[in-house]
Amino acid sequence: ARHFVSGFDRPNIQYRITQKRNPRQQLIDFLRREHSGDAGIIYCLSRRKTEETAAWLQQQGFDALPYHAGLSADERLRNQQRFLREDGVIVVATIAFGMGIDKPDVRFIVHLDLPRSVESYYQETGRAGRDGEPATAWMVYGLQDVIKLRQMMDGSQGNEQFKRLERIRLDAMLGLCEITSCRRQALRQYFGEQAPEQCGNCDTCLNPPPTWDGTEAAQKALSCVYRTGQRFGVAYLIEVLSGVESERVLSNGHHCVTTFGIGR
């Protein structure tokens, strides 16, 4: 029998991840600038958010439909059929949407909330560009996403081992968001594949974020921790490193340590 082996790389998908500032404005700018008239899927964490986002996009002139498990079977089927058969339809969905959906010309996948894991992210973004043409996987994330997901995990029915595994997966997803190196390389390495250092088709390759060598700053901070007796919090250590002659710093005599003011 013949075996077909496929890797995890989807070279036609451009991966882009950015922090939430004004997510609705960021979304509308992305759609109007790059994907006006294209079919796509927008993933949200809650059912309520899918409906609110779909309604808002309709007001902005987009053909957007909600999809989640709380809708009636008839409405889910109707929205799904419109997405599959018509051009330029956007589905705003929870993760309930996508399994078994094979629409080759999906031009973008948007995540308005952080996925639970790299596995989920890869599976959901993989629904874009199945025709081999260029597609975009675009995500905005924020600290509130992480807090919300951790609360959901802690409140789930799983045992402690399951919850710990869920937290590890979430941490890996957050790590993918915060790296400054190639996202495609990180994705492929996560799944055990070798990959070149740069793909040339993700945000960190196309617009490398500014970086700096924090070695010296870390050494100064650790030295300050040691010289102040390893018993003070971050705010106090910042005062010492910044050379602030506060009442507490003076009373402890830490204006005399060698690390006083070296972080100015």
Where are these regions (language model features)?
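Pre-recognition alpha-helix immediately N-terminal to the DNA-recognition helix
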Residues: Q26, A172, K220-S223
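Short acidic/histidine-centered micro-motifs embedded in hydrophobic/aromatic stretches
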Residues: V140-Q144, I179, Y190-Q194, C205, ...
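Proline-centered turn/helix-capping motifs that create local helix->coil transitions or kinks
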Residues: E133, D145-V146, E178-C182, Q194-E197, ...
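Helicase motor core with emphasis on the C-terminal RecA-like subdomain
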Residues: A1-E160, L165-I168, A195, D203-T204
